[in-house]
């Protein structure tokens, strides 16, 4: 491992950034408020590694918060985007690539008979909320504490991601009348869902099938199936927000993994291979309510951008079932190794993975809800984060964010990562001053 050099160039750029951006960043969690210290400024990435502007090299387990399932700058994606760029960067018209990517998605998620591309996951979930309300003629939406569905007003109620990291349960600026239409309960509390759904006519029950914006929280056995039953019995639409889980936890996403088909699905991250794109979709019957075939309006200048479509086609094309299985195997090796390190050092640790999505909490016992997650040792996480960073391992700068693997993380990368994390945990246990 090459010794880290001081982050002088990063500090200089961040000082300038704070003059131009709130907190110096364009998304709050990047500001390191959850761990303290100064962010490094990224310069380039390749494969399993990322480099900062000072030349320091890291094994990357953030992977742009999930999209880079093939790793940084995979040749297949670079080639596809380069070829598309030669033909034009944007048209604002239908293109063949839009259809090709939609076909690739439907091939893995057959329940998505029709989709609509957007430029961000927030656009996709906002559009789903509008569609669900229009179709059901109801106004209330049920979400779960700590689940993050983008920064649309309807979803900034007891949300996850940066909202959780900064300790903001809600956001100022959301009208009270609108906030009252978003109901919440604890993830995995099926009894609470049942009570709410019987008392209030719900337009939709929306969830991250595996919560990645409060750390990494899996549904308990029967929870997803129970939501499907309640939705069917009460007339609500079941919505999977698979912006994070889509094509990561299984070849066909949460529907394949859990054997439950939602009414509507939001996708993002992986389907753009690192470029800005998201989508929402469902049955033809539901999606034909969207303009121009129906009255529910949604539009976007850059929706279906040809460069993003090219990146998505290349990514899904390379992400075969065998490649997906191998990434899952390497993720299991990493998580098992991390558990072993914690056990040897006598540290309580809950570490889990599904597919190539993983996470851990410094605490005993399984984590079933955001309240459980908040009982973890956040101070130890902060020290561990910084110790890992100085040893060339880049983790998410928050105890409440999932981590990711890619096809570029092979046995050698996993082995070296575990060696560094072992050393990092030892340092974190002795560094009681923290950061």
UniProtKB/Swiss-Prot annotation:
Keyword match Translocase: no
Cofactors: pyridoxal 5'-phosphate
The protein's Enzyme Commission number: 5.4.3.8
Pathway(s) of this molecule: Porphyrin-containing compound metabolism; protoporphyrin-IX biosynthesis; 5-aminolevulinate from L-glutamyl-tRNA(Glu): step 2/2
Localization per record: Cytoplasm
Catalysis: reaction(s): (S)-4-amino-5-oxopentanoate = 5-aminolevulinate
Gene Ontology BP term (one): protoporphyrinogen IX biosynthetic process
UniProt keyword terms in alphabetical order: Cytoplasm, Isomerase, Porphyrin biosynthesis, Pyridoxal phosphate
Main localization, broad class: cytoplasm
GO MF terms, alphabetically ordered: glutamate-1-semialdehyde 2,1-aminomutase activity; pyridoxal phosphate binding; transaminase activity
Pfam family, one: Aminotran_3
Assembly information from the UniProt record: Homodimer.
PANTHER family: GLUTAMATE-1-SEMIALDEHYDE 2,1-AMINOMUTASE (PTHR43713), GLUTAMATE-1-SEMIALDEHYDE 2,1-AMINOMUTASE 1, CHLOROPLASTIC-RELATED (PTHR43713:SF3)
Name this polypeptide is given: Glutamate-1-semialdehyde 2,1-aminomutase
Record lineage: Bacteria, Pseudomonadati, Gemmatimonadota, Gemmatimonadia, Gemmatimonadales
